[in-house]
Amino acid sequence: VGSEMCIRDRLKRRSIMKKIDIYEELKSNDYPGRGIVIGKSADGKSAVTAYFIMGRSVNSRNRVFIEDGDGIRTQAFDPSKLEDPHLIIYAPVRVLGDKTIVTNGDQTDTIYEHMENGQTFEQSLRTREFEDDDPNFTPRISGIIEPNKGGFDYSMSILKSADGNPQSCQRYTFSYNNPLDGEGHFIHTYM
């Protein structure tokens, strides 16, 4: 009975979303990790997205964003300090036709390639898990903006270990149809 109550309590807490001031939320946290914001402009005319990264290690802090065609990719700020590029050099933003993909890792390419071959956002992410950066097992966060009749919808996903246990990958996807003017959603790795 005790564990059942614990599960219900955790589910209840997870299902509650509250409005926040993103600036205040990030300012009050020493290390928010990586995050994605997707929403709709206040005038209702545009989709809006933002992505941020922070790093703990010298290798992770040694990166900058650069434009790459219709998207963005990371690159080493100082190539002589680059140690292991596999988790820090990637395209966080790619455009596939009229869809915009935003992620915190190389799963951007996975989503792009699978969707190019007719699979969905969720099907693409079923082929991936959290990052292999033991002991952190950093969650993979992803988002996609897709047009619909006269507007757009978006989805966000997080793939994470089971409270630090790499034996299990927990997959959460949140879909937002016809978003409200001036509102958005924020998904992050460590907050």
Show which residues each predicted segment covers.
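Short, small-residue-biased leader/transition segments that mark boundaries at the very start
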Residues: 1-7
